[in-house]
């Protein structure tokens, strides 16, 4: 398992493979062409040959949650376009991110001057609309990676995915707003039925909704709520998703990948 940052993965990748070991990367350091992302709950298509050392990427936590939900939805609709807004916990940045949020919160509550360190501005009691640097078109690397991982996990490389990743002032647990444009009118009852039956998904009853801190943190399930059609377009479906980014999105999936490789 490599979860110590992209630089560590790149530095030791060849040494690991030369030793006859397979590598499970949680740092998103390797291109998906070299280390395809795998979500065992969706099957093992795309997994490299297990008879030799290989590199496998554990998908980003948001991709795990999104792909699980979309795989269930594909039983009753055909996605034509995805709009995804991911509000990510500060633990996305690792231990330093958790420490930064705790420190900023303490400084503000004690009326002390705020000095951002790990991030470039105030994140406590705030929402940051960008994570990392952006390219010439305004897209962050994490957003592009998220879109490509969802496409690969669904086996739909041409599926348009518009992703926005924001940094939220919570320690653990990601929240996602997912919009799905289908090729025809959507049967909401059928959607609810497949979500209720899907492995790894907990559908919250109508009139209620899940939260990351109140429902998802510490759980192995992906929570889904606020399932509804578009206001004026019966081909559009909107959902709210909450998931534990560390437990479900990273650790559990990495262990499940390892079980396939052993």
Q: What feature does the model see in each segment?
A:
Residues 167-169, 244-248:
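Glycine-rich phosphate/pyrophosphate-binding beta-alpha loops
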């Amino acid at each position: 398992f490599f979860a110590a940052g992209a630089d560590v993965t790149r530095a030791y990748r060849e040494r690991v493979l030369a030793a006859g070991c397979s590598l499970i990367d949680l740092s998103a350091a390797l291109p998906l062409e070299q280390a395809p992302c795998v979500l065992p709950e969706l099957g093992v298509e795309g997994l490299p040959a297990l008879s030799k050392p290989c590199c496998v990427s554990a998908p980003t936590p948001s991709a795990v949650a999104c792909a699980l939900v979309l795989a269930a939805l594909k039983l009753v609709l055909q996605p034509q376009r995805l709009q995804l807004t991911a509000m990510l916990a500060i633990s996305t940045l690792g231990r330093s991110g958790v420490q930064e949020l705790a420190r900023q919160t303490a400084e503000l509550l004690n009326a002390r001057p705020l000095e951002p360190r790990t991030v470039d501005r105030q994140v406590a009691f705030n929402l940051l609309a960008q994570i990392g640097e952006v390219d010439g078109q305004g897209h962050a690397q994490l957003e592009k990676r998220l879109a490509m991982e969802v496409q690969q996990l669904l086996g739909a490389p041409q599926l348009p995915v518009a992703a926005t990743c924001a940094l939220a002032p919570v320690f653990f647990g990601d929240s996602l707003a997912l919009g799905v444009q289908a090729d025809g009118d959507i049967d909401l009852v059928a959607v609810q039925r497949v979500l209720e039956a899907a492995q790894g998904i907990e559908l919250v009853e109508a009139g209620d909704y899940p939260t990351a801190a109140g429902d998802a943190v510490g759980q192995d399930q992906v929570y889904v709520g606020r399932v509804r059609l578009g206001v004026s377009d019966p081909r559009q479906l909107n959902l709210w998703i909450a998931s534990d980014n560390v437990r479900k999105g990273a650790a559990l999936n990495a262990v499940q990948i390892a079980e396939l490789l052993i």
